[in-house]
């Protein structure tokens, strides 16, 4: 008898990937500030600027609307311009923030994502999402047809906490109605998998993205690999 009844997936680098390679710096950003220009900056200064601009999202992940996301990411870009000494304007910041929210072409489904979810759904599994993300994700979930297969969603911007905070996993478990040992969580980040494991959820690491630190958890290279891995839990 299969002990697994529910599979939770992260979104970023698990089912979705950013076309530019960065979730917050999309193609339009690199049209304004080419990669060659960014690469010529002192990388310590650049990283400090990026981290400083992003810090408010870590300190307060709660968000209520796409409009709030646009406003907050406008401030993100303005801070980044200032800290990195980039010649960006307020108008640039607004355009980048609006593009982040409204342009569906800033991210793609990772190959085999949709087919894997369909196979799991047809196999009787409950499917959930546990993701650190922002309100713009709703229109992408629909555009990529993930909502045809996903039963439940746990988003950081709704709860006001980020993984590895255990409240993210508690919320997902409560929505699922299943015991932790009946669930798998697929994510790229070890710290998130450790948190899930501490709750009794089976962790599986996806290493689709280059440079991911790996550990001792079961691993998959792409979403469809979960189908074979599930046989180990039967």
Predicted ranges, named:
Residues 1-7, 17, 91, 114, ...:
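Asp-based, Mg2+/Mn2+-dependent phosphohydrolase catalytic module
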Residues 2-111:
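N-terminal helical cap/lid subdomain that shapes the substrate entry/recognition surface
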Residues 19, 125-126:
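Short, compositionally biased strand/turn segments
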Residues 32, 36, 116-125:
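A short, Lys/Arg-enriched amphipathic alpha-helix followed by its capping loop at the start of a domain
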Residues 65, 104-105, 126, 157, ...:
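A generic structural signal for short
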Residues 82, 123-125, 201, 215-216:
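Short glycine/proline-enriched coil/turn segments at helix->beta-strand junctions
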